[in-house]
Amino acid sequence: MSAAFAGPFIERNIHKASLIACLCFTAGMAGTGLCIRYSTMLGTGLTTARIFLFYGCIMGIGLGIGYLTPVKTLMLWFKDNPGLGTGISIMGFGLAKAIASPVMNTLQGRIGLANMFFVLTGVYFLMMMLGHFLLKKPEGWVEPQVKNTVNRLKLFRNKTYAGIWLMFYINITCGLALISYEKPILQLAGFGMAAISVVQSLTAASNALGRIGFSTFSDHLKDRNSVYKTIFLLCIGTAAAAFAVSAVSKGILAVVFILLLVVNAGYGGGFSTLPALLSSRFGMKNISSIHGVALSAWAFAGLSGNQLTALILRMTGSYENVIIVLAGLYLIAFLIAQFVVGTEEQELCVPSGAASAE
């Protein structure tokens, strides 16, 4: 949620934002390590509360600000291909998981959980500070002199913006509903542990490639919303096919594998294409603010995605029912993309003087 509120600050000073992102992220990580190290002394309740503070709040603030900071800058550097720019930025966010997860597992096994956090604090601090010093806008770029403001609540009165937020929310909810249960789905389908590790590496790669692939593809389309329609149709088709043949319960490995690849690619592509789609509808003015508010859908989807799967499994005990529900949600998202999201550029920002006069 920090991304939803930090947008105006990032617009004003991108360098200060990147520094705060670095300090909050690494301070939260170091604090988490300390909580784990002294958990016996602190007690379970106090340790849990402090981990929530450091890992959930402080580190989360750094994560949200750090996610937004490079997006507009890269869109300015790639002004003729903004989808490629956002794809590079957001692919880095997704690819980091594929790289960091095995490193974290190795460190935890060799030096323990608390020391893992301390080592990663140093590594991330160096990398994020390097990014902070290298970050700059293109030579000759001048921000517009007229300051604009965005009323976060009024954003959702705009049909196009509300439609974009909702279809993004559905895409992330569906993605998390499947991705968070990837391992048990693969186990039930009959994959061995070695094969599961390989498949999860490939789905992570599909997620990363979807981020740069779909957003770059949007640069070559008349309407960037067509990317979302493509994602939803692909997910509907593969989910319907997997349901029709009972791929999970009958162990049809190829169909399960393709379904996970497609959903992961669409999940990643939904993230990376979002800022380019928003800029095509509402311009570059305050894009960090507008994009940040749209990312609140990610926060809500994080609460609903895996819970949706858990609810369906508790009620029916079948992954096939999960898959067909997701196909229905993807269909709703496609209809929103087709009939609710407008095609024309609109004005969401108003001059600050006008805003204060209200």
Can you say where each PLM-predicted feature lies in the sequence?
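Hydrophobic core of transmembrane alpha-helices in multi-pass small-molecule transporters
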Residues: 28, 44-65, 169, 254-269
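C-terminal transmembrane helical hairpin of 12-TM major facilitator-type secondary transporters
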Residues: 204, 222-277
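Intracellular juxtamembrane helix-capping segments at the cytosolic ends
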Residues: 65-78, 85-86, 269-282
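Helix-loop-helix hairpin linking two adjacent transmembrane segments in secondary transporters
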Residues: 93-136
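Helix-to-loop junctions at the C-terminal end of transmembrane segments
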Residues: 2-14, 211-225
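A late C-terminal transmembrane helix in Major Facilitator Superfamily
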Residues: 97, 281-316
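C-terminal ends and interior cores of transmembrane alpha-helices
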Residues: 24-44, 237-250
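Extracytoplasmic gate region of multi-pass secondary transporters
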Residues: 101, 158-216, 271, 275, ...
